[in-house]
Amino acid sequence: MISSSMSYRHSTNSVYTLNPHLNIPISTSTTIPPTSFYANNTPEMIQSQSENTNTNNINNSSSNINNNNNNTPDSMSMSTSLSSSPSVSFNHLDLNSINNKINNNTTTNNNNNNNNNNDDKFDTNALKLSNTMIIKNNNNNNNNNNNNNNNNNNNNNNNNNNNNNNNNNNNNNNNNNNNNNNNNNNNSNSNIEINVPSIQFDNEPAMEVDSVAPLNVPSNHTRTTLAMHNTKSLSTSNIGLLNILPNQQSSSSSSLSSTTTTTTTTSSSLLMPQSLFNNSTYNNHHNNNNSSNAGIVGGLNGSTSSLPTQAQVQLQQMQQQMQQHQQHQYKKANLSSLSTVVDNNLNNNPMNTSTSSPAQPNASPFSFSSSSLFSNSSLSNSGSGSASTTSTSTSSSNSMSSSPPPSLKTSFSQLDEDREKMRLEFEMIKKPEMASKKSHKHHQRHYSHNDLDNRKHDEEKFFSALQPNNYGKNRYHDVLPNESTRVRLTPIESGDGDYINANYINGEVPNSYRYYIACQAPLPSTIKDFWRMVWEERSSVIVCLTKLEENGKKKADVYYPETSQAQEYGSFWIHLHKKVMFKDIGVSSLHLYKKGEEFPREVVLLHYTQWPDCGAPPSSSHIRTLSVMVNTFKARGSAKNTNGPVIVHCSAGIGRSGTFISININMAKIERFGNDPSQMNISIKDSVLELRRQRRGMVQTLDQYIFIFKVINDVLTDMGIRSLSSPSKRRSCEMIKSTPMPRLDISIPPPLTFTPKDFQSSISPSTDMIASLSIITQMTQTLKFPPQQQQDNPFSKSSIKISPSPLNSTNISIPKNQQFQHPFQIQPQLDLNLQQQQQQSSQQLNDNPPLNMSSNSIKFPPVTSLSSCHLFEDSKNNDNNNKQQQQQQQQQQKNNQQCSGFSHFLNNNNNNDNNGSSGGGFNGSFLFNSNNSGSSSTNSECSNNNKNNNNNSNNNNNNNNNKNSDNNGTKDKDENDSCESPRVTPIKCF
């Protein structure tokens, strides 16, 4: 199992590449390594079979093999350890000590460490990597030349000539080597596999030799795997698995077969991919030391030509190593029961004829399951390979470091410190949000929206919003009001300043300076500031474009009462007067009272709830309707001297609010210049840019920007003007048909009660416009609220009661008129005289009927015009035109009976002729006459005696009704007593 604590060192002169598996930036070294090389970390050989503890000290000899140890083959595996063992350093090596290492055998007296290590049980774990690759040496590092004779073995193949050139003490070794002809080896034909991992470096290696001991590898092991990791180079993926193929059995052949395996490396110049394992298999036929068929390690890729013996090659290599690296310190570590010979100067070997092998793809230390780690590149070489290995030192942690590369001589404390730093940085790579927080620590006041007003510093532009006492009044810390256009409140004694998150927005038509106020949804702590702004700016229309909660997130707080119970916000008292729903638009009439003020103000709240956050409404019809209603109520407020800006808010006050304001501005331009398209210059882009100069971030998303075009195109299409998408529209606005634009402004002050007739003069009778204006009729006539009682001003200092608003009354009373004041209050003492006058007039009519009814008609003074829909709300007899005249005649007769005292003004005229007016109601004047144009004069002989008659009575019944005049007079007296003054209650007509 490969540990996940892999790390690498980052340098300032590194080139970054991306790991193809994890997309993690990897540092690939571009530095040129120094001439001296280090081998601080060498691979560790761990047994994969714990029951076999015997190891063989394999020295590449020419002809003789000690078969005493070859009888117990062990399968060995190579791995590395995470624990860093202390390494033993020595400054110099002489030739005698080198010979001791070369001629080392487990049977000598100085090999106690080797014998002890043979008893160790090793973990069969897979490849483990650490910061320092440890070599457990089998020798006691004896520098005594006299002990060389005791450490000699029969496996040494050094010639006398070579030993004489090196050291005189090696004569003993040569003497022992001359006995190679003795047939001590019973298994002379046994195949020996020399499994030697080696790594080839460039001419300028960067690894320090850790030990020069020969490698002890069992001869008959099946497969050996070695992972090489180099941390001295600035690469992070110099990991390779060096696989040694099984033994190749050959009983009679004396040829040499060599199998090489390359390591998987990166593009680092330190660790080249030519490092191979050479498996030399050969046969020993009791030959002498001069045998040329012996397995000779000549280098990394040796040839099969006649080469010196193994001892000569090793001595030459060690001499060259000592001459070149004598100034460096060498570190030594213990390897359990094994030792390796590190050959680091292979390129300087004149006998090395290397054949390059293809490089494997990069393997990141973070992708342990990568197939590149376990890919093998096997080549068959004609020569035997070298028994030398070089391991790279592993660094700790897994991330880039900004520190410069360490010096060549590093201590373990520095490595531990670097390991901890790299571990922390790798954790930051796993969590990029942590790195982003750190990188943006000094940029917390940079906001996400585009700022089109080119200013140097945000602090200058949002100075008031960034003050400590005002910063908490912002719903979103990245949506702040511009300093130049923000709304400034009047400071009050309680300590509240002048700040509120709101900006003035100008229109694009004349007389539209500061026509809008774009603000955020009020917070619980800023509701009183919001109503203070409404009062100080004298606003009469509030447009809310958000819900209280959207997608599980709170977007706004309730700042107005939802029931008829009034609520207090600071120094203001809000009362919900009435509320009507129309096409997903809630229209609420609010009464705003202020402490110290006598009379309230009426504010209309338009709440549209079908606009999604950061999106666009499903259709443009509702937004067009909302725009018409806003302008209508704005003009109505102007008539009441509350012509303040239209307050528009959503949640943040920039996205939906900016979209609606842009639509309303362009619709106003179309309305103003609709009849003259040459002056109408509509540019959505310029409009949005102007909005963003006044408040930052207006129109947030692309969908909202496209929705503006959609709505304006629909308006232009209805107007008969080509749409904005038409190419000809860009040149000029050509009229397809001359259709006047609906006018939204009201030139004259509107009456107290609105009817559809009041808007016919200013708005064309289109379907959408009539539907949008019907809400005003609902607000004024067909209210869903019960009759409201008179509300007292809680802040009033006088005892004067505030009369209810005219919008709350469903019936209109007749205004006061002196001419009609007394007839509605008849005294009882005049009843007798009236009855006598009625009897006399009836007798005169029977004796002398009038010849012309129209000539003697009497007209009464006109009354103030009233709408018939209020006077006859409960009338249900207007089925057809034929019955309408009879109904009006009966109603007029009943009115005459109720107000019979009015007859003393008639100067005893008994002729009640037809007035000739139409039978559709009252046209400008209130006439107490019959409207039957086709009946005879006898139909109205007794106008005060028709109470007991049916609706379809004839002229023959009039004489019978005259007999009951006395009884009717008494009944009229009782009815006249029940009549009340119009000051108290309105007239009820049935």
Swiss-Prot record:
Where can this protein be found?
A: Cytoplasm
What GO CC annotations are associated with the protein? cytosol; endosome
Catalysed reaction, written as an equation: O-phospho-L-tyrosyl-[protein] + H2O = L-tyrosyl-[protein] + phosphate
Q: Which PROSITE patterns match?
A: TYR_PHOSPHATASE_1 (PS00383), TYR_PHOSPHATASE_2 (PS50056), TYR_PHOSPHATASE_PTP (PS50055)
Kindly give the Pfam families that the UniProt entry links to this protein: Y_phosphatase (PF00102)
**Low complexity bias: start-end ranges:** 52-88, 100-117, 137-191, 250-271, 278-293, 310-327, 334-413, 796-806, 834-850, 878-916, 924-968
Question: What Gene3D superfamilies does this protein's entry cite?
Answer: Protein tyrosine phosphatase superfamily (3.90.190.10)
Chief location of this protein within or outside the cell? cytoplasm
Indicate, by first and last residue, each region the UniProt record lists as having compositional bias (Polar residues): 127-136, 786-795, 851-868
The task this protein performs is described as:
Seems to dephosphorylate a protein of 130 kDa (p130).
**Name of the protein this chain belongs to:** Tyrosine-protein phosphatase 3
